[in-house]
């Protein structure tokens, strides 16, 4: 792991974060999306997309088609291990199936609180309201969650690909075809272009769930 990945935020930032930490805690029972059949007035289903391997337990989330190589990990860590990944789907013939939220099943116990994942560079100088939160941009309309080792392995893999062809990009020359292939293999709750993928970086045991 390089120096940038292990650098902790400044003490001033950490103090501000501690003072507003409870405001940023989610008050919604997110686990209900994976245990109930109806949320609000909408029927929901649960889609299993395999598991994710966290070899270090230092994890990140981002739009994988835009920021996979540059995203900083969360300050919060979890025990290293391999965990199931589930998607809460809102099926709709009228609007198309929508993915409401994602769950990495770290424990079979019911969560007692939800803490917002933070990377340590968020702007905490402005007043934070009860419903405010920090997150990542979804310029390409997708998300992922993975271990920081997966990011490192992907960067090395992609550097080798770029040596062969410097004009390629991750979406058009990798994920586009993989998403379409996965949609053909697992068409439930997917459009033909593909709405989720669980891809392992070649020659590693690190995988990347995309949704």
Regions found by a protein language model. Give the residues of each.
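Intrinsically disordered, low-complexity acidic regions enriched in Pro/Ser/Thr
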Residues: 2-211
């Amino acid at each position: 792991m390089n120096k940038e990945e292990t650098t902790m935020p400044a003490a001033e930032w950490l103090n501000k974060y501690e003072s507003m930490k409870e405001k940023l805690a989610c008050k919604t029972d997110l686990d209900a999306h994976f245990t109930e059949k109806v949320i609000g007035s909408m029927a929901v289903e649960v889609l299993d997309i395999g598991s994710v391997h966290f070899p270090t337990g230092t994890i990140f989330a981002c739009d994988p088609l835009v920021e996979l190589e540059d995203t900083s990990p969360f300050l919060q860590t979890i025990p290293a291990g391999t965990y199931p990944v589930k998607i809460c789907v809102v099926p709709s013939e009228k609007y198309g199936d929508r993915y409401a939220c994602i769950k990495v099943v770290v424990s079979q116990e019911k969560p007692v609180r939800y803490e917002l994942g933070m990377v340590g560079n968020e702007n905490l100088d402005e007043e934070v309201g009860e419903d405010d939160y920090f997150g990542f941009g979804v310029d390409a309309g997708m998300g992922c969650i993975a271990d920081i080792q997966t990011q490192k392995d992907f960067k090395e893999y992609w550097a080798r690909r770029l040596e062969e062809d410097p004009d390629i990009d991750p979406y058009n020359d990798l994920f586009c075809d993989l998403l379409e292939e996965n949609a053909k293999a697992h068409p439930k709750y997917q459009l033909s272009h593909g709405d989720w993928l669980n891809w392992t970086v070649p020659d590693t045991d690190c995988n990347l769930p995309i949704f």
